[in-house]
């Protein structure tokens, strides 16, 4: 059995189905881009989320959502509508997370425009995971550990021995 991690975008909203044995499965269509030479190619994977796993997350998964999926990999063979044999990559999902590189195009575009308007050089500016501007000169003086561990209280019942 193979296990792998895949990062991509959902090609459709999740579909909920029931198997012939009455088991619930949610199917995600995941598009994973790969580059071969100068050509971009998208590989489509069928991701099966079994039972009630990730039910709280599912309402937030929509077409275009960026996700990171980990799970067991298998290949499924089938006949296409025109009668030719086809195969599909199937992932039985073990974990799924939102990708920090997901498409939030309107927010990303506005942050990029703000960033380019404020500076003429891109050498010292980049965007962080939440889209905040990371200016190397502005954060050089800051103590990165300031406030670390503040506000934590330990109670004797918390200690396991």
From Swiss-Prot:
Subunit and partners: Homotetramer.
GO BP term, pick one: DNA replication
Gene behind the chain: ssb
GO MF annotation terms: single-stranded DNA binding
Protein name in UniProt: Single-stranded DNA-binding protein
Protein origin, superkingdom: Bacteria
HAMAP family: SSB
Gene Ontology cellular-component annotations: nucleoid
Annotated S-S bridges: none
SSB domain mapped to chain residues: 1-100
Species of the source: Chlamydia caviae (strain ATCC VR-813 / DSM 19441 / 03DC25 / GPIC)
């Amino acid at each position: 059995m193979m296990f792998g991690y895949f990062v991509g975008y959902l090609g459709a909203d999740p579909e909920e189905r029931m198997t012939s044995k009455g088991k619930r499965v949610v199917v995600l269509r995941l598009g994973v881009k790969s580059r071969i030479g100068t050509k971009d190619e998208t590989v489509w994977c069928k991701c099966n989320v079994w039972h009630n796993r990730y039910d709280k997350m599912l309402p937030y998964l929509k077409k275009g959502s960026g996700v990171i999926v980990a799970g067991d990999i298998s290949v499924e063979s089938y006949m296409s509508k025109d009668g030719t044999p086809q195969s599909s990559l199937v992932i039985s999902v073990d974990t799924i997370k939102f990708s920090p590189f997901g498409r939030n195009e309107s927010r990303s575009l506005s942050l990029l425009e703000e960033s380019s308007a404020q500076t003429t050089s891109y050498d010292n500016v980049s965007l962080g995971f939440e889209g905040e501007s990371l200016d190397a000169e502005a954060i050089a003086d800051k103590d990165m550990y300031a406030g670390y561990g503040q506000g934590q209280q330990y109670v004797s019942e918390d200690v396991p021995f």
